[in-house]
Amino acid sequence: MMLLLSCLFTPIIWESSDSTFRNERLAPVKILFVNKFLYSRGGAETYFLKIGEELTRRGHEVEYFGMYDEKNTVGNALHLATTNMDFHNAGPEKLLYPFRILYSFEAKRKLKQVIGQFQPDLIHFNNINFQLTPSVICAGAECGVPMVQTVHDVQMLCPNHMMMEFNSKKLCEACMGKKSKWPCVKKRCIHGSLPKSLIGAVEGTLYECNHVYDKIDRFICPSAFLEKKLLTVPRFRGKTVMLHNFLSRVAAAAPAEKGDYVLYFGRLSEEKGIDRILEACKLLPDIPFVIAGSGPMEDLCKNCTLPNVKYVGFQTGKALEDLVAGALFTLHLSIWYENCPLALLESQSLGTPVLCNRIGGIPELVEEGRTGILNDTFTPAAYAEKIRALYADKPLLAEMSAHCIQKKDRMMTLERYCDQLLALYGDVVKNA
């Protein structure tokens, strides 16, 4: 191991459900990030790419391993990546996908080559299923490298990653903690497809039975909710750390001048409740709404003919910041177990209150009545009632906007997050 631990301590401490770690100032370390996508695509990619940038800035050595794509922005010295698997536009090669998504010998072989050349002190896994498969965990274990994994969703507990039935959209925990994932097949939980659900169930059952996740030294949970779910399964007990996600942009110093609109920004998908949001918009013809984002239900938003709804497409950077900062409040009405949604944090950091469903890890991020309002009934009519009341109460909105700005100093920053992450790395390596 090239990791050198000094005796200089900093006062950063955090607690998980099982133990307390103290941050130790570290000499330069070698970290290998593993994720199926190596370009900015979603929350998981933003997470590890930002961390990688910050660790590099601090003088640590960072390399990456994942799937080949022309859009990749990071990689490793050997320029190794697995063959691209495009489930939506694949040709005849997709006939081999059912075998490759269960166990990728290619990913395992190439990762071992990268490990051999880079000699990392620690491997940090993120999203690996399907395109890389947990075979990469076996590669790390066989090379004797300490490993941590950030748990971005409930995939380790549920084959469809959402704990929500595909057809009924009801929350479901039928597979949680069980070796057999047969309920996934019975309910056709993956895209409503029997073959896909069967493959997902086989994958989940395979990795439950061969205990591959036992090889991970520590699991980072972005919400107390997700940590609690993991701890219902004995193999995760004593291995979890809860760290809320960080803000990657600078928080606002004061509330911006507000426009006259309510905003939804983020992924346009059913689990995010975008269809129900549009139904609520229909019930509120006098309230202007703006929708920004992309995703599976993008056409529904593009083709929306409601005069009070404006779809502005995918936004990023300064344009998105201005849009969020200028909104009266933002909507976060997911119907699935959200983990630690960055959009919710970003809205509050820019001085914009939030209206959220009380589900998953969302309540942990909202000071009810101060930075946002929580909703308990997930119907368009209930949404409309909450939106109407909040839209009409401009003094409350102004007060909550001020509280959001005050809260920014208590939010997790990238710098603070990396301090705590390095402490965790040091603890894992010392005890490996």
Predicted segments with their positions:
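Nucleotide-activated donor-binding/catalytic signature segment of Leloir-type glycosyltransferases, i.e.
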Residues: 299-322
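A short, well-ordered alpha-helix in the C-terminal region of glycosyltransferases
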Residues: 382, 389, 396-411, 417-423
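Conserved donor-binding/catalytic core segment of Leloir-type glycosyltransferases
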Residues: 220, 247, 254-272, 278-284, ...
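Short acidic/histidine- and often glycine-rich active-site loop of Leloir-type glycosyltransferases
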Residues: 344, 359-369, 373-375
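Membrane-proximal helix-turn-helix segments that form the acceptor-binding/catalytic region
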Residues: 142, 155, 170-218
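Conserved acidic donor-binding segment of nucleotide-sugar-dependent glycosyltransferases
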Residues: 368-369, 373-380, 389-394
